[in-house]
Amino acid sequence: VESYKGMHFACFDPDAPSLEEYLGDFRWYLDVILDNDEGGIEFIDGNIKSRLKCNWKFPAENFVGDSYHAPWTHSSALIAMFGKQPTMRPDRSYHANANGHGWEFGLDFIGNAATLNSPQILEYLREHEAKFAERLGKVASLSSANVFPNLSFLAGHNTFRTWNPKGPRETELHTWVFLNANAPEELKKEYRRGVMLTFSPAGVFEMDDGENFENCTAVNAGVVTRRQKLHAGMGLDSRIEHEELKGNVHQSQINEANQRAFYQRWADLMNAETWADVPVR
């Protein structure tokens, strides 16, 4: 059992690498949400458990690289909340991955926190933007991430979840809400309410995603589909070098670089006899 910035991780394999080695460069990205304030984080009371008729890899894949599904999957909810679709900027957004862990993000500090529909939350973020930037650096945005294999974050919503397999076609989802420990009590209520609105079993976005996860699992179980190869080639030539960002960095959120890295890591582990056989990517 080891911990990182207030989160505890456990593994039954005595030969597994240390948590520091396992996370690798991805620790830099986790600090954006776990260590942007000197007081650290705390969990808001309660968690949500629900089940989906899907393979666990579908939701994990969605969080490792989230943005290109959003404009049509969540179109009705986004228009209802904002009156229009948000604008995406490929030139100001990225995919980044390390050993199958993935983070996708843009340079808008508010990011997807805007969907929480809370003026108090937006005011808090704007007031603290300079402080967070001083602590972490300017490139510290709010979007989605997945720690391989099945721990996902929505940083702007301050929620994280685990996708627990209950067989090849069923997943149990556990969801928590967290916040900086120094944040006002009223703000904690706002985040809880915002997550219930957006990413709970009855939330306006979670219901959309659940339809995708379940229907993709069902369709891909078909005989004809299983005979074919699926294409995940978006952004094949998008790799860049970035002076601030860690790991394997790709230009644009509209990408499948992180999805490819996720499945490569899964294949590496499935094919390896021991941890020594698992390559560092």
Residue ranges, per PLM feature:
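C-terminal catalytic domain of Rieske-type non-heme iron oxygenases
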Residues: 3-281
